[in-house]
Amino acid sequence: MLADGHDVSCVDEDPESHARLEVGLESSWEDEGGQFTVGTGLEIDALTTAGIERADVFVASTNGDNTNIVIAQIAQRRFRVETVIARILDPYRAEWYATQGLQTICPTRTAIEMLETSVREIAAGREEGS
């Protein structure tokens, strides 16, 4: 996203996670225009330092569905971010929150769909070869 000219800011409680952001970059995250803030998405100060008040898009992508839901609601309701996306691993929860107006991405559902497609393609290939 940085390469496309977007301003990108990341909040993470693990300062070491900063190194993962630089994979594939020719220079440092900051030199490429990124901003990194140590903290959690539940900390208003960390979100403010990261620039949430200027954000057009906000993505909540922690390791916990409940945390992502709460952080996404903070971004929507308190900071009025126009587009908020929450990564939700539980397909049922992702679907329910989507019906409540929260934009969700469910990697579990995506993986299931990819597996189903692969199995169907393999099965179709076997039927053709019979």
Question: What are the language-model segments listed below?
Answer:
Residues M1-S130:
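Cytosolic regulatory regions of ion transport systems
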